[in-house]
Amino acid sequence: MKFLDLCKVYIRSGGGGGGCVSFRREKFIEFGGPDGGDGGNGGSVWAEAVDGLNTLIDFRYQQHFFAKSGQPGMGSQRTGRSGDDIVLKVPVGTEIIDEDEETVIADLTEVGQRVLLAQGGNGGWGNLRFKSSTNRAPARANPGQPGIDRTIWLRLKLIADAGLLGLPNAGKSTFLSATSNARPKIADYPFTTLVPNLGVVGVDGKEFVIADIPGLIEGASEGRGLGDQFLAHVERCSVLLHLVDGTSSTIVKDYRTIIGELEAYGGDLALKPRITAMNKIDAMDSKQISDRRRALEKATGGKVFTISGVAGTGLMDVLRALWAEIDGARGDKVEEHAPWQP
């Protein structure tokens, strides 16, 4: 399935049906009085987060969603049929943004979460509604309210607990394949990964979701390489795992390149908890591992894990460190949403 994480959609709610002007006509009843029914309500447009989707590709082939209008009222106090609602089914993690591309209308982060995008117009009143003690035979009815035209953007931000960062060929896809159920494409050339991949990782009986995004290069924030468009998919992560290629002769520069791109991207991404791991130690001797780890720890100001995605060395230590951060973040969220108790 092709991956699409941003699309423009045009929606319109249905207009309300017009009210009816009608008078009761029966044998031997000369003045039957008004009996015009109301018009039906127009259909509304909703968005709903559903399980089983991880792309917006369906909206590439259909961008226009117009709800049906309500039917006009009829005589004998019959109300017109209301228009059916339209529901846009989107993946969990979809942001709905106004046409200005800045105002967030809704952020659908849970299965079943719904938001009303365009309310259908109310049906007009029939002349029966206007009957009064002074006007026994009103000959007026209301037209239905018009529908609402709206242009919106859908932006998908995948929901994962941990995000994988690094330069192209840092071994992110190999790490994901070695630690999870994901099977991303792996090859010895840059930008093998072109779209984000998700994998479920198990460690000590616990599970969490990790996201692998295409590699960043220097200047990604300015559009070089694949740009920084995929960084949106790790914005929701509790922790970031920064993989650095240990066989690189510019290991410190490589590390700082990614940090610089995180800072250029903006938001809170550069402030997220981050774990650094030096990868590909299976292709290094002990002195190289020691020297480059020391240089990297000096640059990061913290601990650096040494791992090999190919050989499986050191992976469990990294996964446990990731889980510790994720577990702490989940606990904080539970406390935030806990009801107040005296």
UniProtKB/Swiss-Prot annotation:
GO molecular function: GTP binding; GTPase activity; magnesium ion binding
UniProt protein name: GTPase Obg
GO biological process: ribosome biogenesis
SUPFAM superfamilies, A to Z: Obg GTP-binding protein N-terminal domain, P-loop containing nucleoside triphosphate hydrolases
Binding locations of GTP: 166-173, 191-195, 212-215, 279-282, 308-310
UniProt lineage: Bacteria, Pseudomonadati, Pseudomonadota, Alphaproteobacteria, Rhodobacterales
Gene3D superfamilies membership: GTP1/OBG domain, P-loop containing nucleotide triphosphate hydrolases
Classification via NCBIfam families: Obg_CgtA (TIGR02729), PRK12297.1 (NF008955), PRK12299.1 (NF008956)
Predominant location category: cytoplasm
EC annotation from Swiss-Prot or TrEMBL: 3.6.5.-
Superkingdom of the organism of origin: Bacteria
UniProt keyword Ribosomal protein, yes or no: no
Chain positions recorded as Mg(2+) binding sites: S173, T193
Function (record text): An essential GTPase which binds GTP, GDP and possibly (p)ppGpp with moderate affinity, with high nucleotide exchange rates and a fairly low GTP hydrolysis rate. Plays a role in control of the cell cycle, stress response, ribosome biogenesis and in those bacteria that undergo differentiation, in morphogenesis control.
Subunit organization: Monomer.
Domain called Obg: residue spans: 1-159
Location of this chain's protein in the cell: Cytoplasm
Keywords annotated in UniProt: Cytoplasm, GTP-binding, Hydrolase, Magnesium, Metal-binding, Nucleotide-binding
Key word Repeat present: no
GO CC, alphabetical: cytoplasm
Names of required cofactors: Mg(2+)
Recorded coiled-coil stretches: none
Residues covered by the OBG-type G domain: 160-327
InterPro entries: G_OBG (IPR031167), GTP-bd (IPR006073), GTP-bd_Obg/CgtA (IPR014100), GTP1-OBG_CS (IPR006074), GTP1_OBG_dom (IPR006169), GTP1_OBG_dom_sf (IPR036726), OBG_GTPase (IPR045086), P-loop_NTPase (IPR027417)
